[in-house]
From Swiss-Prot:
Its EC number is 6.3.5.7. It holds the Pfam family Amidase. It comes from Rhodococcus erythropolis (strain PR4 / NBRC 100887). This is Glutamyl-tRNA(Gln) amidotransferase subunit A. The keyword Cell division does not apply. Disulfide bonds: none annotated. One of its GO terms (cellular component) is glutamyl-tRNA(Gln) amidotransferase complex. Belongs to the amidase family. GatA subfamily. One of its GO terms (biological process) is translation. The gene is gatA. The active site is at 81 (charge relay system), 156 (charge relay system), 180 (acyl-ester intermediate). Heterotrimer of A, B and C subunits. The keyword Ligase applies. PANTHER family: GLUTAMYL-TRNA(GLN) AMIDOTRANSFERASE SUBUNIT A (PTHR11895:SF151), TRANSAMIDASE (PTHR11895). It is an enzyme of class 6 (ligase).
Length: 492
């Protein structure tokens, strides 16, 4: 019998819905895989085997009763980043301050997965409160890249990406604040999409930076990712930033793209995201991908977005400022960790709790954000960063007057060794150079595997970017490229 963990989500869905295999069998196969290999990768913080099998059995019983599947992915299990609230398992955000905390409500995204009949295998590891690019900032230990367990799996969503790459889950959910879906996808040879800001509900997503955070789908193929995208997208009145608009036709676009015809599509190569400072193997892989797009019939032109050179500086003022505000809620008074050594004032309890509960990177960003928002510095730092953010959005708008999509490497580097950059925050931040602009503008982007770097035989990703509310363009181009590229090596 075929190892069910080797099949893509779309294949599994077809077999489950035709009752060739059961959802319980598929779910159990992945739970067995987790039990067998996750001690090596540490992709999961919590495994919910009993709940997942109950959800799978409900799907099987419904299908046996002659009912239509609840969704195109009904019965296919998923790994959920541990930053979305769940009532039946802990939500820790990989932080000591929330260790063991169980939320009183499900996130909207969690509810959508349950309603779609998608069993949740468990919660995946991340950088604490989604702050990091390597998943080394987790309070519960780093995740390891299935391609090379001495290397990082990207971040902040390295757990979700590693679960996919190691065949512990056929689907996963991540969040993307500055590249936290796309960069892990690139360095694990998986697919990840940052949807248009406001198209996937943030209700129940523990906030890092509210104007940047966006939940999104992850898979091993473009079609799988599109199928999941349509499940989780949609307006939510409980999220004030949610866009009230129809879900984009991303599945149809992925199927169209797989036919391999990009005639009439204009692709822009961003001059500022193609540098000699990038790893040579990454540039070579990207250049080869661009040639492949040309061969598919796309018209490729170079475009300039000058303000992108300031994206990193802008992002690392906007994000810490919002972090400083959002994480003020962890005050030891309402939920989470409480350090109280007796005879302590409320201020002392709060200070002791935050000192013990937050890790170094979270503290660093809180301090930077508090400083940037302080009296006398607000305009010079935060205000200036917002102006640059506007310029970045304008550069995107000008570019999209000429082209349909933009492309770049997803990350300038392949995955580095665990511990290599922990003591150098700036070196770590540079891995997000190519992904940050999309978040600052609120647009959408995807990372698709583009092969292995000739430098070190490690994965490289092609980033495809599109305007807000044009997510389907990502899937058409991504699926066309994926089909033309053909199969690539897998981690395991």
């Amino acid at each position: 019998m075929t190892d069910l963990t080797t099949l893509d989500a779309a294949e599994l869905a077809g077999k489950i819905h035709s009752r060739e295999v059961s959802s319980v069998e598929v779910t159990q196969a992945h739970l067995d895989r987790i039990a067998a290999v996750d001690t090596e990768y540490h992709a999961f913080l919590h495994v919910a085997g009993e709940q997942a099998l109950e959800a799978a059995a409900a799907v099987d019983n419904s299908l046996a009763g002659g009912n239509e599947p609840a969704s195109a992915l009904a019965g296919v299990p998923i790994a959920l980043k541990d930053i979305f609230t769940t009532t039946d398992m802990p939500t820790t955000c990989a932080s000591k301050i929330l260790e063991g905390w169980v939320a009183p409500y499900d996130a909207t995204l969690t509810s959508k997965l349950r309603a779609a009949g998608i069993p949740i295998l468990g919660k995946t590891n991340l950088d604490e409160f989604a702050m990091g690019s390597s998943t080394e900032n987790s309070a519960f230990g780093p995740t390891r890249n299935p391609w090379d367990v001495t290397r990082i799996p990207g971040g902040s969503g390295g757990g979700s990406a590693a679960a996919l790459a190691s065949r512990q889950a056929p689907l996963a959910i991540g969040t993307d604040t500055g590249g936290s879906i796309r960069q892990p996808a690139a360095v694990t040879a998986t697919v990840g999409t940052k949807p248009t800001y406001g198209t996937v509900s943030r209700f129940g997503l523990v906030a890092c930076a509210s104007s940047l955070d966006q939940g999104g789908p992850c898979g091993r193929t473009v079609l799988d990712t599109a199928l999941l995208h349509e499940v989780i997208a949609g307006h939510d009145p409980r999220d004030s930033t949610s866009i009230d608009a129809p879900v984009r036709p991303v599945v149809a676009a992925a199927r169209e793209g797989a036919a391999g015809d990009l005639r009439g599509v204009k692709v822009g190569v961003v001059k500022e995201l193609h540098s000699d400072s990038y790893q040579p193997g990454v540039i070579a892989s990207f250049d080869a991908a661009v040639e492949q797009l040309k061969a598919l019939g796309a018209e490729v032109v170079e475009v300039s977005c000058p303000s992108f050179e300031h994206a990193l500086a802008s992002y690392y003022l906007v994000l810490p400022s919002e972090v400083s505000s959002n994480l003020a809620r962890f005050d030891a008074m309402r939920y989470g960790l409480r350090v109280d050594e007796g005879n302590m004032s409320a201020d002392q309890v709060m200070a002791a709790t935050r000192a013990a509960g937050f890790g170094p990177e979270v503290k660093r960003r809180i301090m930077i954000g508090t400083y940037a928002l302080s009296s006398g510095y607000y305009d010079a730092y935060y205000g200036s960063a917002l102006k640059v953010r506007t310029l970045i959005a304008r550069d995107f708008d000008k570019a999209y007057e000429k082209v349909d999509v933009l492309v770049s490497p997803t990350s300038p580097f392949t995955p580095w060794k665990l511990g290599e950059k922990v003591g150098d925050p700036l070196a770590m931040y540079l891995s997000d150079l190519c992904t940050l602009p999309t978040n600052l503008a609120g647009h959408c982007a995807m990372s698709v595997p583009s092969g292995l770097s000739a430098d070190d035989n490690l994965p490289v990703g092609l980033q495809i970017m599109a305007p807000a509310m044009a997510d389907e363009r990502l899937y058409r181009v991504g699926a066309a490229y994926e089909a033309a590229r053909g199969p690539i090596a897998t981690a395991v």
